[in-house]
Amino acid sequence: MSLPETKSDDILLDAWDFQGRPADRSKTGGWASAAMILCIEAVERLTTLGIGVNLVTYLTGTMHLGNATAANTVTNFLGTSFMLCLLGGFIADTFLGRYLTIAIFAAIQATGVSILTLSTIIPGLRPPRCNPTTSSHCEQASGIQLTVLYLALYLTALGTGGVKASVSGFGSDQFDETEPKERSKMTYFFNRFFFCINVGSLLAVTVLVYVQDDVGRKWGYGICAFAIVLALSVFLAGTNRYRFKKLIGSPMTQVAAVIVAAWRNRKLELPADPSYLYDVDDIIAAEGSMKGKQKLPHTEQFRSLDKAAIRDQEAGVTSNVFNKWTLSTLTDVEEVKQIVRMLPIWATCILFWTVHAQLTTLSVAQSETLDRSIGSFEIPPASMAVFYVGGLLLTTAVYDRVAIRLCKKLFNYPHGLRPLQRIGLGLFFGSMAMAVAALVELKRLRTAHAHGPTVKTLPLGFYLLIPQYLIVGIGEALIYTGQLDFFLRECPKGMKGMSTGLLLSTLALGFFFSSVLVTIVEKFTGKAHPWIADDLNKGRLYNFYWLVAVLVALNFLIFLVFSKWYVYKEKRLAEVGIELDDEPSIPMGH
């Protein structure tokens, strides 16, 4: 679409309104549009966390699944939600745009939650209640009942992936970075975006969990379905006020193109002088411009990828013909190399989210056996997650007000701890949390054995579990912001969208690894002496926690080696005399 030339300050040349005309600053975008988008994010967080954090009690108490099976169902659901964000981001950047992606996937999410609600209403979609006289022989959910449940959960996960991948980016599209006033408003937008995430989280682990446990699952899930439909209606009502940006394509396409081109040219010989490789200068000479690309110097690492930039004259490739699947610029190759350099750091972040997964599964099962009463009020098991959220918020507040100033004063570094330092601390706290959880479980188990199998609620207060929730919250505040900062800073300018994908994929893989670990442990410990028993009082859950603690500790040591090896992009380029262009960050919640 060609844009008419104009000198009006109110007309934006890089954004359109819903009718395809250049966007008018006075009629589109700004806070009115952003507020409607924030509604979607708050409800998405409320729904995903509200279902996930309390799902294990539904699976064990209503569907009569074992603890290990229930834990894997929850972690697979949450892992899929995060992994599908990659698909949602690809679809939004390449095909549909962010607006349509949000609208379509929010409708899919609403469908999934509606089916989940119906499964709690229709008696035939859940097994009968246990007979008090034969409680050890509860009838498990049938294949059809589980099929409906999984359909509901994974439709919800699919919808979550599309919404989560697009909502922060579409919100930022409502502000013009080239205009100082709107640029400052964008910063406040991301603050409010994070606020909405936390509001949704707190409502999920308190009000929504209480409704599910004390009023009824049909009401708890029904509220989620209604909230999604309401938020989607508000979102669609703002259509004529939104600003729309052109499709930018997925950065994964560039990665794939470089790999394919390098493979096609694998038999060609690299020139001794890298200046003979195809680069942005050749495109500038042929086409007159190469917007958005800052030429990067050649590096000696991963030289096999350099073959993507070899001109193959026999294949008909010249400087005037640019097919990215047969010939990539050296700058494109160097950007992909930078992604490859980040992969060891990326990989060592995964295990922290395996620790986090325990809070929504086995820790909830632990809390069911403890005395959770405060006076006449009993805290729902899943509401223990409020201490995790509290640890996260407290750490964020202290870090902003104390740690940043302290680092500036002691180390002359104005941004607080460096990204890799925060990631390392987060991993340390993750291992510590699992060690604490193992010690707490030992105490809980000794008390259970002392009082015999007939005592369902042990004479131990819920406060015993607070440390493990709190420590994970502290660790997550550090590692999440550290990962986000690291990926945003280190991703090449032309591939900033990869930062979101790299972050969310560690969450997804962490949840999936938890499922794999539980399955392996269940297989090797058997039914005679299980670590994760259906009745925790007959298991050895503390051994599983020790296993996770040791794995995360070893992972932490590996991370220290990789972080010592890693050189920040800014320093590496400064050593060859290149100053980075100003690269705006893309904050994002999770």
Curated annotation (Swiss-Prot):
What does the record note about the induction of this protein?
By nitrate and auxin.
Q: How does it sit in the membrane?
A: Multi-pass membrane protein
User: Major location, coarse class?
Assistant: membrane
Tissue expression profile of the protein: Expressed in the stele in lateral root primordia before emergence and in the tip of primary and emerged lateral roots. Detected in emerging and immature leaves, guard cells, flower buds, style, stigma, anthers and pollen grains. Not detected in the shoot apical meristem.
Q: How is it modified after translation?
A: Acts as a high-affinity nitrate transporter when phosphorylated and as a low-affinity transporter when dephosphorylated. Forms homodimer when unphosphorylated and monomer when phosphorylated. Low nitrogen concentration in the medium stimulates phosphorylation. Phosphorylation also regulates the nitrate signaling.
According to its UniProt entry, the protein's GO biological process terms are: auxin-activated signaling pathway; basipetal auxin transport; lateral root development; nitrate assimilation; nitrate transmembrane transport; oligopeptide transport; photoperiodism, flowering; response to herbicide
A GO molecular function for this record? symporter activity
Q: Which UniProt keywords apply?
A: Auxin signaling pathway, Herbicide resistance, Membrane, Nitrate assimilation, Phosphoprotein, Symport, Transmembrane, Transmembrane helix, Transport
What the entry lists under PANTHER family is as follows: OLIGOPEPTIDE TRANSPORTER-RELATED
- What else is noted? When mutated confers resistance to the herbicide chlorate.
Q: What is this protein called?
A: Protein NRT1/ PTR FAMILY 6.3
